[in-house]
Amino acid sequence: VRYSRQVTDGLSADQLFEVMGNMLGELRDGHVNMSSSFDLARNWSWKEDYPTNFSDTLLRRYLSTDYRVSGGLRYRMLDDNIGYIYCPTFESMPGEGNLDEILYYLAPTNGLIIDVRSNSGGLLTAAERLASRFTDSEILVGYMRHKRGPGHNDFSDMQEQRLSPSTHLRWQKRVVVLTNRGVYSAANEFVKYMRECGATIIGDKTGGGAGLPFSSELPNGWSVRFSACPMYDTRQQSTEDGIEPDIAVGITDDDFARGRDTIIERARQLLAGH
């Protein structure tokens, strides 16, 4: 009612867009947005209100310039014989051959770091494909509910989400996943899967975004997107507001000034047995 009172016949397109954008903002959902030819109404508070805990400058110091790239993943062996993979997005699907080559190359290392910091998501199938390399048996990784009617609580019963092991090369050593508040949507799901695969999560709480988005077009041509299918962890707790790390670490000012990524260094210590 509060917003309907603000809509009058004399509103310009910009003014109407602002009113509707503010109304959608009440949901505080990063998957909810509205787009027009001139703007995108969005809620990015899930990452903008928190420390970044990630730096491209620091990342370049670890990857250097001779890192390998395969299937959109950047990887190398660090100088302490720890494998490192940076996964910036799940917008594209890495090929099974790509993942075979990466894991084969990193097989001699003593452990593996998968860095998904600031990965805002993409394809759930891409997240599942990568996670399937880290389990030797089918496991329960969470639950999902589907919208089945117009009512506020018209959702299905909990439906199991299960992860099957890849039929290709699988990792058998320790693995750490690095997170920050920029981890969202499919990347948030990846962290949920990897926790059930036995990985240690290090960094900051993820941004969340545990709802499959649905898009539609408004009569005036603007498009609107909203969450339709809520998702939960194995304890049937919503991960919409993020997943807490096993070891909470942030990049310190001192380390940043020295060119050190505090979160990567903590993962290296763990994998080295310290």
Listing of model-derived features with the role each one plays in the protein:
Residues 125-260, 265:
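Conserved acidic, small-residue-rich alpha-beta core segments centered on
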